[in-house]
Amino acid sequence: MKVIFMQDVKGRGKLGQVKDVPNGYAQNYLIKQGLAKEANKGNLNTLKRVEANEKAEYEAQKAAAQEIKKQLEADETVVELKAKAGSDSRLFGSISSKKIIEGLDKQFGIKLDKHKLELREPIKVLGYTNVPVKLFKGVESKVRVHVTQEN
């Protein structure tokens, strides 16, 4: 019997996959547990529609990420932050991902999740720093951060 997997089933199939499985296994386990549906015309058409919607959503998210990348890579996009520092240019404290994200939002209206920034450790010195950003699968950029001394 052909079934459409509604969830990943270890050793049998993955979500959205159409496979031939033994009739008893399909009827008595997969379908009863809600792990799969029978692969009839209606269910196959539904699967195609769902896949098309997911692909369109994926493309829309990727396009949005490309747009944000274009904004981040513009020359005028430099996040200006102020912090107290000593005479040796070392900060009293540090600049975290959260502060960079807040600066991006306030100064440029770019909203990002702080987990997209790949800041290995907080910024602890004055000056310019390039912070890598992973916007989407295969879409990466850098945010330029300029830390100046607070009076």
UniProtKB/Swiss-Prot annotation:
GO terms for molecular function: rRNA binding; structural constituent of ribosome. Pfam families: Ribosomal_L9_C, Ribosomal_L9_N. NCBIfam families: L9. Binds to the 23S rRNA. It comes from the Bacteria. InterPro entries: Ribosomal_bL9, Ribosomal_bL9/RNase_H1_N, Ribosomal_bL9_bac/chp, Ribosomal_bL9_C, Ribosomal_bL9_C_sf, Ribosomal_bL9_N, Ribosomal_bL9_N_sf. HAMAP family: Ribosomal_bL9. GO terms for cellular component: ribonucleoprotein complex; ribosome. Belongs to the bacterial ribosomal protein bL9 family. GO terms for biological process: translation. The keyword Ribonucleoprotein applies. Keywords: Ribonucleoprotein, Ribosomal protein, RNA-binding, rRNA-binding. This is Large ribosomal subunit protein bL9. It comes from Lactobacillus delbrueckii subsp. bulgaricus (strain ATCC 11842 / DSM 20081 / BCRC 10696 / JCM 1002 / NBRC 13953 / NCIMB 11778 / NCTC 12712 / WDCM 00102 / Lb 14). The gene is rplI.
